[in-house]
């Protein structure tokens, strides 16, 4: 089974580890694995070198039996030690660089230097607060109250041919992506749907999981309260 097929199966939980924030990333990974996470995302918006990414991926794969996937915030965040990469295009950025400019450069880098990476083309749609990702990518986040706009972006992503849509409320967001927005996007997009940002309790995770996204991501929670990961994972599995 390749990574894309793995992502399509059911509703999975992935833990996002940002090496720029997480000095003790192995401790977080161990907590996540013990909690039953289905995969690890590695990446961040700022300050990560290629050598740092490679070492983090190598270390985590040494203790993990789940996919380790790159979630790159820049062109330096690539390594073929990972199982795959979310090849992100920030659809609601106001700067063409984050929609297609960086992707042109990244595509050449992957083809030349990381050909073993499984590439998952991903429409990255930033909503609500947007967090650091929204600020860095100069995005115009979709309001929480407009699931119809999010669905329109997802429909465009479907017609363009993206393999995945990632609804992002932002790192440490005050609110998660609302379930009704997840529902609207799920109806518009038939392939892999990923939801992340602001998911801080089992109750929230369960409400989102009931709308049948393929992946629910927690990051800040894993950094600040890793002992709560078990509650989140159980809620997703029981939804």
From Swiss-Prot:
Binding site for Mg(2+): 18, 45
Catalyzed reaction equations: sn-glycerol 1-phosphate + (2E,6E,10E)-geranylgeranyl diphosphate = sn-3-O-(geranylgeranyl)glycerol 1-phosphate + diphosphate
Matching InterPro entries: GGGP/HepGP_synthase_I, GGGP/HepGP_synthase_sf, GGGP_HepGP_synthase, GGGP_synth
Major site of localization recorded for this protein: cytoplasm
Biological processes annotated in GO: glycerophospholipid biosynthetic process
A single GO cellular-component term on record: cytoplasm
EC number assigned by the record: 2.5.1.41
Cofactor(s) this protein requires: Mg(2+)
Pfam families per the UniProt record, alphabetical: PcrB (PF01884)
Entry's localization field: Cytoplasm
Listed SUPFAM superfamilies: FMN-linked oxidoreductases
Protein family per UniProt: Belongs to the GGGP/HepGP synthase family. Group II subfamily.
Function: Prenyltransferase that catalyzes the transfer of the geranylgeranyl moiety of geranylgeranyl diphosphate (GGPP) to the C3 hydroxyl of sn-glycerol-1-phosphate (G1P). This reaction is the first ether-bond-formation step in the biosynthesis of archaeal membrane lipids.
Protein name, as recorded: Geranylgeranylglyceryl phosphate synthase
